[in-house]
Swiss-Prot record:
Domain of life from the UniProt record: Bacteria
Protein name: UPF0303 protein Bphy_1660
PANTHER family xrefs: PTHR28255, UPF0303 PROTEIN YBR137W (PTHR28255:SF1)
UniProt similarity note: Belongs to the UPF0303 family.
Gene3D superfamilies: Haem-degrading domain
SUPFAM superfamilies: GlcG-like (SSF143744)
Secretion signal span: none
Length: 165
């Protein structure tokens, strides 16, 4: 895995995956789609979609644990703080051999710089919330969210997917 290349790819994902508008119905549609593909693939996940300060969708699939719920909360907090994908934040920290606590004074009890939370970006508004999954390795969590966003927004996932690790 090339961190610099992944960071460029994530920046392209964040630039492309913009909603023309986003509301509670959009959150429900996106969350239901994530739930269905996770269920079809037999994935044990927590799925959390929220605007900042307000939950919009939550689902816990068979086999997911309270730890997955807490990881989702912490990854979502990271997006809220940095307005970037939690995976991008983690990769940037990895590049500088730092942690959220070292570099930003953020407690690990409330923030996680691991893949799986992606900013919800509305055209003309900017980052309005996050969509998060937790239950897979962090790169796979990130990619599942990107795959679902591509499907919802009509983008070709193969053009936005991270390079194979």
């Amino acid at each position: 895995m090339d961190i610099a290349h992944d960071l460029q790819s994530i920046a392209a994902q964040e630039h492309a995956l913009v909603f023309p508008h986003f509301d509670a119905d959009t959150a429900w549609q996106l969350g239901a789609y994530l739930h269905e593909i996770a269920k079809a693939r037999g994935l044990a996940l927590a799925i959390d979609i929220r605007s900042f300060g307000q939950p919009l969708f939550f689902s816990l699939l068979e086999g997911a644990t309270p730890d997955n719920v807490d990881w989702a909360r912490r990854k979502g907090n990271t997006v809220a703080h940095f307005r970037r994908s939690s995976y991008a934040v983690g990769l940037k920290l990895q590049q500088s051999n730092a942690t959220l606590a070292d570099k930003h004074g953020l407690p690990v009890s409330d923030y996680a710089a691991h893949g799986g939370a992606f900013p919800l970006i509305a055209k003309g508004t900017g980052v309005i919330g996050s969509v998060t999954v937790s239950g897979l390795p962090q790169r796979a969590d990130h990619e599942l969210v990107v795959e679902a966003l591509c499907a919802h927004l009509g983008h070709d996932y193969s053009k936005l997917a991270l390079a194979k690790a």
